C-alpha cells in the first residue's frame, strides 16, 4: 500500500527540478498521484474500507491545493505536469 523507498526515489528523480529536490509542487503532486492510484486499486477490491476512502479524499484534496498553487505560480509548469501525469485538467 505505501510507497517503497525505491519507487519514491524514482518519482523524485523523474519530477525533481534540481538534484535533491523533494519539496517542489511537482514532486509532491507526483507522489500523491501515485498514492491515489494505489488507493483506488485497493478500494476496487475492498469496497467497504471507509477509513481508506477518507484517506483517499484527503490526498485528493491535498493534491488539488498543490495543483491550484502551481497553476497560480507558473502555468507552464502546471500544464507540463498535468500532461506528464495524465491528469484530465
UniProtKB/Swiss-Prot annotation:
It comes from the Bacteria. One of its GO terms (biological process) is translation. It holds the Pfam family Ribosomal_S15. SUPFAM superfamilies: S15/NS1 RNA-binding domain. InterPro entries: Ribosomal_uS15 (IPR000589), Ribosomal_uS15_bac-type (IPR005290), uS15_NS1_RNA-bd_sf (IPR009068). GO terms for molecular function: rRNA binding; structural constituent of ribosome. One of its GO terms (cellular component) is cytosolic small ribosomal subunit. Keywords: Ribonucleoprotein, Ribosomal protein, RNA-binding, rRNA-binding. Part of the 30S ribosomal subunit. Forms a bridge to the 50S subunit in the 70S ribosome, contacting the 23S rRNA. Belongs to the universal ribosomal protein uS15 family. PANTHER family: RIBOSOMAL PROTEIN S15, BACTERIAL AND ORGANELLAR (PTHR23321), SMALL RIBOSOMAL SUBUNIT PROTEIN US15M (PTHR23321:SF26). One of the primary rRNA binding proteins, it binds directly to 16S rRNA where it helps nucleate assembly of the platform of the 30S subunit by binding and bridging several RNA helices of the 16S rRNA. This is Small ribosomal subunit protein uS15. It comes from Acholeplasma laidlawii (strain PG-8A). The gene is rpsO.
